[in-house]
């Protein structure tokens, strides 16, 4: 015991985590019976030194009292433990920040395989697994290759971080790729090549665990001999060289695939049609027979017909496509799909590898069609059930990102693949062209909805000139919804859904001819009438004269830019602003996952930059801003806000702090640069290097110059950009803010001080240079210097006096 104590203290002093216990043999047996974790640890007991006779006694007693007759329970417990572990660490083995130890396809999955084999077959080494028939020689080599790679990754990760870090996060992936010798190539950088190798290994681990755990589960959970008697009288159905027995599909002959390679596709079709599991030995034969999928089979009409039926199945096509992918069949049948298997994109926006994203998108499309997502997507569900070509939409979803990782634009390359693949799968020329168009322009609806002012007629006209037909519009809406939802948890929200629906209905109206400049006065008049009808119900004390006077305060564009509820809020705010100088109202919209902030006060330069600074100080992100000014100079700003991580909805205390912060910023009591200097940067964001970009366009809006800025996100970025525009005497008419992981895209609709587009070249150059300087400054916002603080306080005092004067 003294020796053990000395060794333990030495190991602890070295900072190592060491589990320990002192027990006699009977204690060991008692503990192993009661606790599966302790049982597993004792399963791997090895003799180091000391009384070997005592160790032999323990091994014999452990085998007789613990191992004997309990294999079925152990297998079930380990498989249940595996499933729970996967649920905790992420259900997919293709998460772009995987857990090397506990994640799906990680080291613990290999441990589980060995523990089960050791328990059931009494082996001590990996090589013994071949002699006992648990592994083939090829599978043993694969096991060792996976084990060596994952241990190398884990050791490098621990050395790099200086701690027992198991998650392979973005902030470590670049250094890991460098340490393990990966180099960049055209289309893929070194990080993406390293992570692709990781995911291919994780896929191999998945192949091993799926086949062998299924085999063991089948063996160890077999009922007793008498219980099996009724099964002898069950009829086994044979279909195209396969046997359906119970819930399993099994090949009748081992040469079923060599005799007819089309059976490699047909087998998955049968499994999907009858909702069957595939026998592990049959799956093993599939893996061995993948080389039979050659050019002739890919051009085979029957094979392509079977695949299209699988893809468009109403019976959960994602499940069977996932099995085809895991077996390596999907990538062989569609070589372009094979190129993106296990491919990640080194960014924080995409949560999964490219192939996993496409398979999840197919699953979401199927759920949408079955009505399981109708509450979240009523429009997309209606279109899917009434107006959509199923072959077109399912193929477009499968192909929309199939050309990722190439030097060229993946949308253009994907469209070429679609034009080549459509006829092969039996689509008509028109269907193929529609699929190709959807793949080429699959981002246009999302980009327009999230980055453009949808109340600007020019935005809708430009979008419609691209879409051209209702058929394209309907299919594009469904594809866009599915694509965004499949990116990962928390990416979709109700606000994005509202924007997409708004764009769809505006475009639909223009396509069918019910919206045009000619009937704009009529639309304004109808909107004003609707407002008066609702206003009289909400504010019956308003006289007719007061109503007419209020309507006259607004420009025509106002009546077409806001929904009726917002207009009523504005009426209440403007009627009470005279008493307090300014009014703020914050309402929750949990369906759209946003806080809506309505604010009014006398307009003055820099108002939006102050509001955006206050929101940043309060820890909230502006995702949309509509800024209006009445004819008599009152600002009406509508901001939609979200939590940066989108995991929690802001509580009432947070809302109160937001309002108090806005008041303090407007009164000059809080200076945003001071507060934002203390906001910590995310280490994960700092792992990325982005090319900053400022785009200025005078053609995409009918009334404003559009400035689009993209770069690495950081706290207070929108405030810094808005502040720069204010300093350049630029008026912000409206703004959009979108975040794609680490990349922020902020869009401003701006005018000069006379309310016109900015066309002077020197001014445009100054805007470009000023915004580029903001993007280039990746440091935290600096605290305001004494002289500047005095100047800012003076400006805030003038603004405060303006508010009081109102």
Q: Which positions does each model-derived feature cover?
A:
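Divalent metal-dependent catalytic cores for phosphoryl transfer on phosphate-bearing substrates
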Residues: 1-3, 8-13, 131, 143-152, ...
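Conserved catalytic alpha/beta cores of large enzymes that bind or transform nucleotide phosphates
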Residues: 12-20, 29-32, 291-311, 366, ...
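Hydrophobic alpha-helical scaffolding
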Residues: 48, 52, 61-72, 96, ...
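Regulatory modules associated with amino-acid/nitrogen control
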Residues: 149-150, 182, 188-249, 317-319, ...
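Active-site-adjacent "gating/activation" loops or surface patches in catalytic cores
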Residues: 230-250, 326-346, 352-397, 402, ...
């Amino acid at each position: 015991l003294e020796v053990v104590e000395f060794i333990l203290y030495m190991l602890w002093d070295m900072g190592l985590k060491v589990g320990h216990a002192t027990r006699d043999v009977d204690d060991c047996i008692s503990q192993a019976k009661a606790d599966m974790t302790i049982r597993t640890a004792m399963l791997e007991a090895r003799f180091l030194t000391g009384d070997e006779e005592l160790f032999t006694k323990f091994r014999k007693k452990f085998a007789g009292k613990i191992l004997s007759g309990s294999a079925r329970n152990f297998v079930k417990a380990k498989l249940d433990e595996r499933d729970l572990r996967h649920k905790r660490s992420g259900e997919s083995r293709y998460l772009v920040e995987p857990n090397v130890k506990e994640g799906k396809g990680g080291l613990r999955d290999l441990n589980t395989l060995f523990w089960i084999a050791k328990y059931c077959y009494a082996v001590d080494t990996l090589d013994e697994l071949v002699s006992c028939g648990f592994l083939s020689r090829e599978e043993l080599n694969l096991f060792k290759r996976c084990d060596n790679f994952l241990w190398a990754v884990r050791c490098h990760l621990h050395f790099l971080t200086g701690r027992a870090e198991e998650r392979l996060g973005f902030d470590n992936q670049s250094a890991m790729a460098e340490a393990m010798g990966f180099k960049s190539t055209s289309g893929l950088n070194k990080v993406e090549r390293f992570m692709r190798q990781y995911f291919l290994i994780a896929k191999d681990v998945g192949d091993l665990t799926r086949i062998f755990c299924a085999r063991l589960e089948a063996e160890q959970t077999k009922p007793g001999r008498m219980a099996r008697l009724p099964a002898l009288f069950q009829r086994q159905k044979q279909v195209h060289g396969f046997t359906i027995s119970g819930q399993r599909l099994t090949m009748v002959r081992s040469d079923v695939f060599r005799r007819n390679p089309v059976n490699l596709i047909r087998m998955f079709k049968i499994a999907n049609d009858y909702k069957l599991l595939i026998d592990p030995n049959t799956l093993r034969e599939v893996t061995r027979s993948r080389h039979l999928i050659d050019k002739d089979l890919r051009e085979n009409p029957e094979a392509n017909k079977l695949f299209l039926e699988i893809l468009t199945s109403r019976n959960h096509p994602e499940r069977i496509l996932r099995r085809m992918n895991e077996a390596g069949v999907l990538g062989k049948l569609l070589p372009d799909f094979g190129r993106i298997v296990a491919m990640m994109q080194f960014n924080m926006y995409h949560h999964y590898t490219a192939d996993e994203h496409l398979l999840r998108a197919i699953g979401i499309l199927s759920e949408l069609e079955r009505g399981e997502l109708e509450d979240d997507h009523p429009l997309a569900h209606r279109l899917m059930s009434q107006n959509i070509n199923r072959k077109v939409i399912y193929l477009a979803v499968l192909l929309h990102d199939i050309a990722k990782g190439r030097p060229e634009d993946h949308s253009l390359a994907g469209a070429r693949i679609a034009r080549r693949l459509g006829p092969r799968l039996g689509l008509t020329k028109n269907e193929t062209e529609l699929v190709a168009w959807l793949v080429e322009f699959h981002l246009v609806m999302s980009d327009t909805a999230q980055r453009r002012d949808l109340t600007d007629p020019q935005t809708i006209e430009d979008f419609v000139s691209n879409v051209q037909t209702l058929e394209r519009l309907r299919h594009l809406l469904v594809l866009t919804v599915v694509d965004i939802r499949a990116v990962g948890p928390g990416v979709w929200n109700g606000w994005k859904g509202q924007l997409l629906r708004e764009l769809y209905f505006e475009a639909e109206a223009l396509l069918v001819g019910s919206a045009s400049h000619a009937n704009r006065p009529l639309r304004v008049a109808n909107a004003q009438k609707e407002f008066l009808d609702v206003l009289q119900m909400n504010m019956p004390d308003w006289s007719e004269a007061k109503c007419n006077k209020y309507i006259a305060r607004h420009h025509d564009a106002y009546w077409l830019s806001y929904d009726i509820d917002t207009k009523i809020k504005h009426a209440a705010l403007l009627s009470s602003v005279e008493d307090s100088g300014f009014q703020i109202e914050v309402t929750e919209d949990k369906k759209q996952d946003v806080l809506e902030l309505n604010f009014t006060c006398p307009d003055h330069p820099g108002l939006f930059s102050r509001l955006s600074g206050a929101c940043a100080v309060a820890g909230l992100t502006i995702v949309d801003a509509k800024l209006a000014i009445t004819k008599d100079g009152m600002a009406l700003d509508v901001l939609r806000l979200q939590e940066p991580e989108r995991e929690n909805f802001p509580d009432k205390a947070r809302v109160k702090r937001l309002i108090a912060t806005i008041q303090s910023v407007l009164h000059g009591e809080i200076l945003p640069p001071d507060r934002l200097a203390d906001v910590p940067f995310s280490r994960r964001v700092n792992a990325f290097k982005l090319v900053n970009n400022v785009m200025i366009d005078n053609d995409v809006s009918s009334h404003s110059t559009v400035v689009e800025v993209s770069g690495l996100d950081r706290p207070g970025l929108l405030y810094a950009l808005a502040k720069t525009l204010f300093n350049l005497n630029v008026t912000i008419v409206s703004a959009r803010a979108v975040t794609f992981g680490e990349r922020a895209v902020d869009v401003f609709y701006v005018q000069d001080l006379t309310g016109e587009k900015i066309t002077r070249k020197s001014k445009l150059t100054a805007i470009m240079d000023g915004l580029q300087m903001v993007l280039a400054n990746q440091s935290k916002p600096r605290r305001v210097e004494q002289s500047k603080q005095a100047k800012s306080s003076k400006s805030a005092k003038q603004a405060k006096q303006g508010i009081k004067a109102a």
